[in-house]
Curated annotation (Swiss-Prot):
Gene name of the encoded protein: ppc
Pfam families on file: PEPcase (PF00311)
Role description: Forms oxaloacetate, a four-carbon dicarboxylic acid source for the tricarboxylic acid cycle.
GO molecular function, one term: phosphoenolpyruvate carboxylase activity
List of catalytic residues: H138, K545
Record-linked InterPro entries: PEP_COase, PEP_COase_bac/pln-type, PEP_COase_Lys_AS, PEPCASE_His_AS, Pyrv/PenolPyrv_kinase-like_dom
Upper classification of the organism: Bacteria, Pseudomonadati, Pseudomonadota, Gammaproteobacteria, Alteromonadales
Name of the protein: Phosphoenolpyruvate carboxylase
Cited SUPFAM superfamilies: Phosphoenolpyruvate/pyruvate domain
Top-rank EC class of the record's enzyme: lyase
Cofactor(s), by name: Mg(2+)
PROSITE patterns: PEPCASE_1 (PS00781), PEPCASE_2 (PS00393)
Alphabetical UniProt keywords: Carbon dioxide fixation, Lyase, Magnesium
Organism: Shewanella pealeana (strain ATCC 700345 / ANG-SQ1)
Assigned protein family: Belongs to the PEPCase type 1 family.
């Protein structure tokens, strides 16, 4: 039998060997031998050898302070290199067909056009696709940008080494480059010295676009055009943009006091600066390429019959782009530059129109081959990225807007908005929205917090429409939450409609979402404002933390169904914005699968989805990977639109509702009602220590003095993934499945898993989480860190985990977890011998730091490295 993963293992082995050689050179043979000994003991321990486990623990506890950091670093870097090898394997020539599926768009077009779907319908759907991927800087991207660039260079070398035509000398050069890169990685500090600022996070997002997506977008569209042309003999429009990008980096101020209006302005300027700089590079290349003389009448008239008409136009654009960059540099340095608006690029049309004129002229002169090269690529980049690169969303908590209006009504002697009921609030807001006089007096001195909200609205109001995305209201629950934002935007002079998007996050708010939107749709003023277009955001992270994954998933599904129904009834075009995380406990998982498991009718050619933290790098970090991801999104949205999943049968709904009800009871019985739970959580996980890790710019808690409910979803998930119990991603689900099976519903569950994509996805995600959970490791954390009087809770949690595993295996009738997804299983098994020692060392270091009043710098750094290493190994941190 051919080993499907031979090339993957070979690359992992090569990178691991080079890392070992690097460590030997830096330290010595003895230290490398100790690392190898621990790795082999970890493998034996995982196969059930208790003696090996004890020997490994003895070795780990005997590490000196000086050995801690290089040891943690070695295992951490091996896991990062394993991730690189796996990432490369999916784009490698040697990738097995079970890992690298055929192009999903190609397959889908074949199914659709070979089936019952009319060609015109397929083309119409494709041309109107509106997929908006929203990049967010959640603090799950552990790796520093410096290292990420080196990891990309490693993949470049692996790609080069796949070329079978290389000479021996060329092979040696590429191997030398690999050794140099891995040495650079080894000698670079992995842990940031300080937390990134919101501007740093935004720059990280821009670097992903520059390094990968800038090339991937035209590559993907060229591939898509070719596929469509081969099957339909039709060319896609020049300005087609099925996928666009937005960002929360520098715009998401929910619970982040460091994101101010000043920061948001700087990020907007940086976005525009990056776009201008990259377009300038394209134009410089085009000046060299478009040296031809033949032109149509329009272009010749524009250039006064110049001998180099194309170059004349491009030189003018080059001059304007350089002036635009100079202008933005001045702004970023804090100056107020004085410029002639005609000298710089202000609008998308300033860039697009001259290039379209060149494109048309080339085609008219029989030079379509040239027109469809770099010039077409640039036009398609403009259609995707505009001149602002990313549309920036603003997110703010609903309470902050209410505070502004309450302070204002008190100042004006109109009463206290905070004490009014919903009906009174709506009446007041609608009256002011319809009023021709301003509400905010010129001499009003607002408190600092209120002033910051007003400044943000003023900034949003001053921006061009294409620079901004949506204004998202977190913790929205009532129509007044939306109307309050609209009033503030009106008062700050916003000249154009902005998408104001309620985010429904908790279980109660999800269940009430359709009532809230129905009430808004019933308001004539509001319907006039929206012009029949509405966006609603569904929160995954907080609903799962509130109710557990099973109940949250069903609440999200039913909320979407109801929102679709009321929007159709009101003749409103609804876009659903999915606030998914990278992990299962925050709604993560394969995007293709997730989109196809949405309720029928809920996608309808358009969707917004957050792309979080490290998942941005895993999906879009390399141009080839990004092309794959773009194809997956495109095919999934087309399929969900034209071949929607079936409506769930009444008995499936009834069963799912019962599962949700029982799972939320089981989940909350532990998280809310178990008096020792918070104490156990804080002791058994590195939750407290995570606060010291300089990951993201946002504080880990909404309130410093709060408990679990105030903890953000990301550190909540991150902490449980560190001790390998993965609790938020399964608690409550297995208990509900077992209860359903015991009351005779097993056959019904199996029918649902086979025929209902929504339920199949839920079970698939549970399987993956159960496979990653390690009860023996979590027990070791408990023994090392948790007071003995709390151990009963750990026993109960591990029993619940075992119940869930049994329930899923009974449902799927499989002998082992992930039996049907061998690639995922291989991925987990490849990493375990390297993650396990880091986990054991982490528990040891946590015990040490908690015992000692002041830990050494080495102990603290080693602890941070174990946290980063486990995160790299688990591949989905928060």
């Amino acid at each position: 039998m051919v080993d499907m993963y031979a090339s993957l293992r070979s690359n992992v082995g090569t990178l691991g060997q080079i890392l070992g050689d690097t460590i030997r050179t830096d330290l010595d043979d003895t230290f490398l031998e100790k690392i190898e000994q621990i790795r082999h003991l970890a493998k034996s321990s995982r196969q059930g050898d208790d003696a090996s486990r004890e020997e490994m623990l003895t070795l780990l506890s005997s590490l000196s302070d000086d050995e801690l950091v290089p040891f943690a670093k070695a295992f951490n870097q091996f896991l990062n290199l394993a991730n690189i090898a796996e990432q490369f394997h999916t784009i490698s020539r040697n990738c097995d067909e079970l890992v690298c599926v055929p192009d999903p768009v190609e397959q889908l077009l074949g199914r659709m056009l070979g089936g019952k779907i009319d060609q015109e319908k397929v083309l119409a759907c494709l041309k109107t696709l509106d997929i908006d991927l929203v990049l967010t800087a959640h603090p799950t991207e552990i790796s520093r940008r410096t290292l990420i660039q080196k990891y990309s260079a490693v993949i470049d070398s692996l790609t080069a080494l796949e070329n079978t035509q290389l000479t021996e000398q060329e092979k040696k050069q590429h191997h030398l480059r690999l050794r140099q890169l891995i040495a650079q990685i080894w000698h670079t500090n992995e842990i940031r010295n300080e937390r990134p600022t919101p501007v740093d996070e935004a720059r990280w997002g821009l670097s992903t676009i520059e390094a990968s997506l800038w090339q991937a977008i035209p590559d993907f569209l060229r591939q898509l055009n070719q596929q469509v042309e081969e099957r339909t003999n039709t060319q896609l429009p020049i300005d087609i943009a099925p996928v666009r990008f937005s960002s929360w980096m520098g715009g998401d101020r929910d619970g982040n006091p460091f994101v101010t209006s000043t920061v948001t302005q700087e990020v907007l300027d940086r976005n525009r600066h990056t776009a201008a700089r990259l377009y300038l590079k394209d134009v410089v290349l085009l000046v060299n390429e478009l040296s031809m003389e033949g032109a149509n009448e329009e272009l010749l008239a524009y250039c006064n019959n110049s001998n180099e008409p194309y170059r004349d136009v491009l030189r003018d654009l080059r001059k304007k782009l350089r002036a635009t960059i100079d202008y933005l540099n001045e702004k970023l340095e804090g100056h107020q530059p004085d410029v002639n608006p005609k000298d710089i690029i202000w609008h998308e049309s300033d860039l697009k129109d001259p290039l379209m004129m060149l494109y048309k002229s080339l085609c008219d002169q029989g030079m379509s081959l040239i027109a469809n090269g770099l010039l077409l690529d640039m036009l398609r980049r403009i259609a995707c990225f505009g001149i602002h690169m990313l549309r920036l969303d603003v997110r703010q908590d609903a309470q902050r807007h209410a505070d502004v209006i309450a302070e204002l009504t008190r100042y004006l002697g109109m009463g206290d908005y905070a004490h009014w009921d919903e009906s009174e609030k709506q009446s007041f807001l609608l009256r002011e929205l319809s009023s021709k006089r301003p509400l905010i007096p010129a001499n009003w001195q607002a408190s600092a917090e209120v002033e910051e909200v007003v400044k943000t609205c003023r900034l949003v109001a001053s921006q061009p429409a294409r620079a901004m995305g949506s204004y998202v209201i977190s913790m929205a629950s009532q129509p007044s939450d939306v109307l309050a934002v609209l009033l503030l935007l009106k008062e700050t002079g916003c000249p154009h409609p902005i998408r104001v998007v309620p985010l429904f996050e908790t279980l109660d708010d999800l269940n009430n979402a359709s009532n809230c939107m129905s009430a808004l749709f019933a308001i004539d003023w509001y319907r006039g404002y929206t012009k029949g277009i509405q966006e609603v955001m569904i929160g995954y992270s907080d609903s799962a933390k509130d109710a557990g994954v099973m109940a949250a998933a069903w609440a999200q599904y039913t909320a979407q169904e109801k929102l679709v129904a009321i929007s159709q009834e009101a003749n409103i075009k609804l876009t659903l914005f999915h606030g998914r995380g990278g992990t299962i406990g925050r709604g993560g998982g394969p995007a293709h699968q997730a989109i196809l498991s949405q309720p029928p009718g809920s996608v309808d050619g358009r969707i917004r989805v957050t792309e979080q933290g490290e998942m941005i790098r895993f999906k879009f970090g390399l141009p080839k990977l990004a092309v794959q991801s773009l194809a997956l999104y495109t095919s999934a949205v087309m399929e969900a639109t034209l071949l929607p999943p079936p409506e769930p049968k009444p008995e499936w709904r009834q069963c799912m509702q019962q599962l949700a009800d029982e799972s939320v009871v089981a989940y909350r019985a532990i998280v809310r009602e178990e008096p020792d739970f918070v104490s156990y959580f804080r002791a058994a996980t590195p939750e407290i220590e995570l606060g010291k890790l300089p990951l993201g710019s946002r504080p880990a808690k909404r309130r410093v003095d709060g408990g679990i409910e105030s903890l953000r979803a990301i550190p909540w998930i991150f902490a449980w993934s560190q001790n390998r119990l993965m609790l938020p991603a399964w608690l409550g689900a297995g208990e509900a499945l077992k209860a359903a099976s015991e009351r005779g519903d097993l056959a019904l569950l199996q029918e649902m898993e086979k025929h209902w994509p929504f339920f199949k996805t839920r079970i698939s995600m549970l399987e993956m989480v159960y496979a990653k959970a390690e009860p023996n490791l979590s027990k070791f954390y408990e023994t090392s860190l948790v007071p003995s009087e709390l151990h009963h809770l750990g026993v109960q949690l591990r029993e619940r985990l075992a119940t869930g595993v049994e329930a899923v295996l009974e449902l799927t009738q499989a002998e082992s977890l992930m039996a049907h997804t061998p690639w995922n299983r291989e991925s987990v098994e490849l990493r375990n011998p390297y993650i396990d020692p880091l986990n054991f060392l982490q528990a040891e270091l946590l015990a040490r730091t908690r015992r000692e009043e002041q830990s050494s710098q080495n102990v603290e750094l080693a602890l941070m490295l174990t946290i980063a290493g486990v995160a790299a190994g688990m591949r989905n941190t928060g």
